[in-house]
Amino acid sequence: MPLHPPARRPHGHRRNGSEAQTEATTQDTGRLSCPRRVGAAVCPIQGLGHRAARRPRRGVGTTSASRAPRPGALMPATRNRPRFIHYRVQPPRTHVSFKRPKRSRTHQSHTKVPGWTHEKRMGSSVEEGLRPELSQLEQDADNLGEEEAARLPVTSLNGLLMEGDRHPNPGQGPFFYIGGTNGASIISNYCESKGWQRTQDSRCEDYKLKWCEIKCRDNYCSFREGQQLLFQLPNNKLLTTKIGLLSALREHARTLSKARLMPSTQAKVLKMDEFFPETYRLDIRDERQAFFTLFDETQMWICKPTASNQGKGIFLIRSQEEAAALQAKTQSIEDDPIYRKMPFRAPQARVVQRYVQNPLLLDGKKFDVRSYMLIACAMPYMVFFGHGYARLTLSLYNPHSSDLSGHLTNQFMQKKSPLYMLLKDSTVWSMEHLNRYINDKFRKSKGLPRDWVFTTFTKRMQQIMSHCFLAVKSKLECKLGYFDLIGCDFLIDENFKVWLLEMNSNPALHTNCEVLKEVIPGVVMETLDLALETCQKSLHSQKMLPLQSQRRFVLLYNGETTDLWPRLGSSRPPIRLPYANSNHARSTCEISSSSLTSTRVTIADRPAARKSMSSRTAPICASRKSRLSDSGGVSIEESETSVCSGLPEGSRDAAREPSLGPTEEEREEEQRSTSHRGS
């Protein structure tokens, strides 16, 4: 029976199913004849146009198990052409065919038959895992003859798809994913030493560890609590942005001022102005006007974006002209009608901070110290302090210089110097080197204790870190498996007063200097060791201490003994009382019970934590609140209450401080300050 021309063949044209099948030929003179193809034939459907009608194919189709015959079965057909029905399985790459000239490829099926659902996303783990097997099937099809190719079983491919649904990732796992290049080689070597396999699929949900430089909402939505480790707390911007840290410290200071503490206890609590330079927000009109009112040319100020790092967007304000220019610019932005419609007013998200003009110099160069705060576990909180290194500028310090590389010590700024490659090792000192230098140069002249760096200075950094953590502890989103490593930058002035400059998320983990090659790998590996061990102990309800993986990090805060925290999967949080009749050494940051006038009350509103509390717990909390009110303390219902003293000598654990609920005005301010993306 003569065939219709391909472009004119009617949609309903079919061959009689009882007749022998003949090879389809093409009549298009502009194309060469194509070898016989093997795959799932497409039913001619009205609406697909001439292009669909010009594709005469012969092969084996698939059908749904619930609505169609068994695999490979032919449906009753009429006239000259057999009709095949697709299975309702996932459609990607179900056609194996030939491409001229004799080059195999796979066709993506886009057939839209009634009831067909296209739910598979591009780049899915199933599709990625099937690529090697599909390629092998193509090669096998190339080597087969025409008769053998016509009988190629589709069931093997169908089974392959089903197997891919059961095992989204190839290999045995467990898997880890690293997003970015910061410390990637160190993290990869650590994970591979444990037999883990690296995946390049950022959407992979079957992982043991995910370490990403940039936070992504999807990572936290698909996170499996207690089964996975995820780097960076979701809202760590409360600490790691300039406005977030400033707002947290201010609120904490107001909380402490309202708390009724014993005079001896009040004297031990850190004051914000003792360690944090005077700072104003430019996105709040009253603060902005207050800064421009008090500005004078005798003081230098530094303007910073709230959520940037590497010195980007930073400039100095030293003259009245520079201050006036900044004032005019901020005012013009605020008067812009487009800016008024912006929900978070990002262009104004800056702070101005009083510049420390008398820094301690090392061989005439400005420096600061990078230390680490590790939140190894979030349920319960296990917070550690880790030593880092000193960062120096390449050029001598000149307070009147406009070159930022002489004022900012980070490696990103120093790399801009043409002398960096020759002198880069001189821009980073180990803490041992810094300690020796201060012992030799300043111990006698300044009356410092021996090893001031590892005694007084270290204790002060631990005090400041504990204070900052406690300022945001009740607001951090905590789940078992979250962990974070935060870089803290400290400056020492010529009077040996310690200032906290900023805290940074995703701190630099590059090893381009000899000192960094000694420091950074140890920090990263101990971070991962502690995160793994604390997560496993919390998951199995084991005591945290002692920690076998703790080497150089120092414990600042042990939430196991100070918090009411819920176990994963428990119906109610366990009752955790302070040390009683115990021979354990008390936290060196805790105050004796005789000097405490307030204690912890409840865990009522910790974000992201389980909040169920049984009736057995309520009387205990109520009795604590009653004792607290009777003693003249502050009764707090929405957050845990702790009191922080200064860290005594040999401090190992963190301080506890009270945290009052914010007022309505403070909540609005916090919403503005925390709406920006973390650095």
UniProtKB/Swiss-Prot annotation:
Coiled-coil ranges from the UniProt annotation: none
Name of the molecule in the record: Protein polyglycylase TTLL10
InterPro entries given in the database record: TTL/TTLL_fam (IPR004344), TTLL10 (IPR027752)
Biased composition (Basic residues): 1-15, 96-110
Organism: Rattus norvegicus (Rat)
Gene from which the chain derives: Ttll10
Positions bearing the site annotation: Essential for specifying elongation versus initiation step of the polyglycylase activity: 310
Compositional bias segments (type: Polar residues): 18-30
PANTHER family: INACTIVE POLYGLYCYLASE TTLL10
Localization per Swiss-Prot or TrEMBL: Cytoplasm, Cytoskeleton; Cell projection, Cilium; Cytoplasm, Cytoskeleton, Cilium axoneme
Domain notes: Gln-310 is the main determinant for regioselectivity, which segregates between initiases and elongases in all tubulin--tyrosine ligase family. A glutamine residue at this position is found in elongases TTLL6, TTLL9, TTLL11, TTLL13, TTLL10 and favors glutamate-chain elongation, whereas an arginine residue is found in initiases TTLL2, TTLL4, TTLL5, TTLL3, TTLL8 and favors initiation.
The keyword DNA-binding is annotated on this UniProt entry: no
UniProt KW keywords: ATP-binding, Cell projection, Cilium, Cytoplasm, Cytoskeleton, Ligase, Magnesium, Metal-binding, Microtubule, Nucleotide-binding
TTL domain sequence ranges: 172-543
The EC number(s) this enzyme carries: 6.3.2.-
GO biological process terms on file: protein polyglycylation
Job of this protein: Polyglycylase which modifies both tubulin and non-tubulin proteins, generating polyglycine side chains of variable lengths on the gamma-carboxyl groups of specific glutamate residues of target proteins. Involved in the elongation step rather than the initiation step of the polyglycylation reaction. Polyglycylates alpha-tubulin and beta-tubulin. Polyglycylates non-tubulin proteins such as nucleosome assembly protein NAP1.
